[in-house]
């Protein structure tokens, strides 16, 4: 895959339930701390190196932001780093909340 793919929140949740995909949230630390999707990893400039060391390049990666816009750039970045299956979650965390999918709140 030379480019990321789009996935809706239901498709993202289905991949997570299969136990193979990794969900990353690229929102700011305050937003992530208030609420985030269950099992989401907070991907930041400070955590990217550890993330890339811990995750297999073949593992599907789901990238979530606020509304599904900035996740596209982050998803393409991960593809460029060598990740093979990268998805931008359409609608982002807002769509995840609207769909009433599992959320962790502080």
Swiss-Prot record:
The similarity annotation says: Belongs to the GlpE family.
Keywords attached to this Swiss-Prot or TrEMBL record, sorted alphabetically, are: Cytoplasm, Transferase
Q: Name one matching Pfam family.
A: Rhodanese
Matches recorded under InterPro entries:
GlpE_sulfurtransferase, Rhodanese-like_dom, Rhodanese-like_dom_sf, Thiosulf_sulfurTrfase
NCBIfam families on file: PRK00162.1
Question: Per its UniProt entry, which superkingdom is the organism in?
Answer: Bacteria
Gene of this entry: glpE
Q: Which residues form the active site?
A: 65 (cysteine persulfide intermediate)
Q: Which GO terms describe its cellular component?
A: cytoplasm
Keyword Transferase applies? yes
GO-annotated molecular function: thiosulfate-cyanide sulfurtransferase activity
Q: Does the keyword Membrane apply?
A: no
Q: State the function annotated in the UniProt record.
A: Transferase that catalyzes the transfer of sulfur from thiosulfate to thiophilic acceptors such as cyanide or dithiols. May function in a CysM-independent thiosulfate assimilation pathway by catalyzing the conversion of thiosulfate to sulfite, which can then be used for L-cysteine biosynthesis.
Subcellular location, in the record's words?
Answer: Cytoplasm
Q: Locate the Rhodanese domain: which residues?
A: 17-105
- The catalytic activity of this protein is classed by the Enzyme Commission as 2.8.1.1
Cite the PANTHER family for this sequence: FAD-DEPENDENT OXIDOREDUCTASE, THIOSULFATE SULFURTRANSFERASE GLPE
Q: Which HAMAP family match?
A: Thiosulf_sulfurtr
Tell me the Gene Ontology biological-process terms attached to this UniProt entry.
glycerol metabolic process
- Recorded source organism is Vibrio parahaemolyticus serotype O3:K6 (strain RIMD 2210633)
Subcellular location, principal: cytoplasm
What catalytic activity is recorded? thiosulfate + hydrogen cyanide = thiocyanate + sulfite + 2 H(+); thiosulfate + [thioredoxin]-dithiol = [thioredoxin]-disulfide + hydrogen sulfide + sulfite + 2 H(+)
This one is known as: Thiosulfate sulfurtransferase GlpE
């Amino acid at each position: 895959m030379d480019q990321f793919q789009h996935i809706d929140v239901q498709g993202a949740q289905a991949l997570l339930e299969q136990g193979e995909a990794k969900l990353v949230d690229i929102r700011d630390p305050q937003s992530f701390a208030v609420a985030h999707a269950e099992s989401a990893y907070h991907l930041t400039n400070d955590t990217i190196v550890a993330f890339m060391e811990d995750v297999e390049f073949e593992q599907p990666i789901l990238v979530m932001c606020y509304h599904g816009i900035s996740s596209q750039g982050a998803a393409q970045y991960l593809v460029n780093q060598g990740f093979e299956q990268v998805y931008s979650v359409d609608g982002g965390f807002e769509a995840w909340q609207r769909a009433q999918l599992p959320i962790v709140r502080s």
